[in-house]
Each structure stands twice: as structure tokens, then as C-alpha cells.
């Protein structure tokens, strides 16, 4: 888990560590004209954690087909100036092969999302990182539930009643799927119509569609 910081040291989005130089995030999080830094190694905001480190972003690469209206192709890769030092709390996620992602991972019951975003809509950000297990949702069910278009580059996950969902401040963060004890990146937290609303689901960038680009 990584956190994106703006020029005022406020965090506003999440990210996924791919290796010591690259962070995966959402294109909607990136403002090309602003300085961007990445915080890694944080689990609890209130504690002094030796694993924490802040890194400057040398270059933010937004997918050329990102659509700011529909959030289609909502994916970006950040290159850091200096390499990360891995530790217990700074760990890269695995990138799956495309077929394995589509045939096996996306057919698991649950994925896992994490972040430091709001506890609920218009609520406050959490102090300690939240990790939620949320079910994959059938594309047709999701399209019927949401007003905005769910494209081929997106998938849905969440509960229709439970209220567990990603929320503001979580965008760009990881959706991972566990298989045989290994965590693979399967998505990027992208958008939703509110958070945890009854009958609605969270929408994620489908990483398997972008593996060659990444």
C-alpha cells in the first residue's frame, strides 16, 4: 500500500507498490501540473513508524486513453526518483499474467481492497489502514445498478446491502486477489456512486486489460 501526498502533505489517493521504482495508481488522481510524492510504510497514522518513507515522483505516466468524464482507462504509473527500501510494511504486490488474471483470479469469490480513505461518505479519513474483503460482482448486475457506464476496462465489486466499500481518499489504491497464499494485483480503486450505498457497487480498473501497457 502506498499513499499519494499533495504539495501540502495531505494524502488524497492510494497506490500499489509494483517494485522499488514504480507505483500503480489511478489516472484520476494525477494532476500533471502539481508536485507529487508517495508515502509508503504507514499502517497507523498516529504512531511513529520506522518503516515510513516519503519519495518524490520523477514522472507520472497517465494512460493515453484515460477519459476524465467516464473514468475509462483509469490507470497511471508513477516512477520514483529514488528506490524504495522494502521491509515488513513496504512490500510489492505481484503482477499476474493476463490469462491467469482473467481465468482464475477474477473468478475467485473475493478480492481485497485497502486504504486510508473516509469511513463513510462525508466522514473523516481513518487513522489506521482499513483492509476489506469484498466480493466480485457480475458485470450485468453492476451495469443495472449504476447510472454511469461500466466499460470493458472496468469491473465491479462490493455488497449490495452491507455498506463495506472503498470511499473518498481510497482512489488509486489496490484491489488484490489472493491465490495459493500469494496476493496479485487485480484492480485499481476507481469510482462509485457514493460509498457503500444500498444497491450500488464500487467500480475498479480491470488491470488485466492493461498488463501489456504497465
Predicted regions and their residues:
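Beta-propeller and closely related beta-sheet repeat lectin domains
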Residues: 13-14, 27, 171-174
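Extracellular trypsin-like serine protease catalytic domains
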Residues: 1-8, 96-101, 109-214
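A generic structural motif
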Residues: 21-25, 74-80, 156
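Serine endopeptidase catalytic core focused on the charge-relay Asp
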Residues: 68-92, 105-115
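A conserved glycine-rich beta-strand in the N-terminal activation segment of trypsin-fold
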Residues: 1-20, 70-71
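Cytochrome P450 core scaffold surrounding the K-helix E-X-X-R motif
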Residues: 47-48, 86-89, 121-126
Amino acid at each position: 500500500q502506498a499513499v499519494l501526498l499533495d504539495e501540502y502533505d495531505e494524502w488524497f489517493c492510494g497506490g500499489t507498490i509494483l517494485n522499488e521504482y514504480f507505483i500503480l495508481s489511478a489516472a484520476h488522481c494525477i494532476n500533471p501540473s502539481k508536485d507529487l510524492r508517495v508515502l509508503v510504510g504507514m499502517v497507523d497514522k498516529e504512531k511513529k513508524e520506522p518503516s515510513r518513507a516519503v519519495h518524490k515522483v520523477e514522472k507520472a505516466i497517465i494512460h493515453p486513453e484515460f477519459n476524465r468524464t467516464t473514468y475509462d482507462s483509469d490507470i497511471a504509473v508513477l516512477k520514483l526518483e529514488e528506490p524504495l527500501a522494502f521491509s515488513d510494511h513496504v512490500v510489492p504486490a505481484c503482477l499476474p499474467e493476463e490469462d491467469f488474471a482473467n481465468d482464475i483470479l477474477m473468478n475467485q469469490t473475493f478480492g481485497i481492497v485497502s486504504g486510508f480513505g473516509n469511513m463513510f461518505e462525508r466522514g473523516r479519513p481513518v487513522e489506521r489502514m482499513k483492509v476489506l474483503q469484498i466480493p466480485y460482482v457480475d458485470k450485468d448486475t453492476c451495469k443495472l445498478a449504476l447510472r454511469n457506464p461500466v466499460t470493458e476496462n472496468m469491473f465491479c465489486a462490493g455488497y449490495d446491502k452491507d455498506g463495506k466499500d472503498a470511499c473518498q481518499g481510497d482512489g488509486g489504491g489496490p484491489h488484490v486477489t489472493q491465490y495459493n497464499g500469494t496476493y496479485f494485483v487485480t484492480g485499481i480503486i476507481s469510482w462509485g456512486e457514493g460509498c457503500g450505498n444500498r444497491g450500488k457497487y464500487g467500480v475498479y480498473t480491470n488491470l488485466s486489460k492493461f498488463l501489456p501497457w504497465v
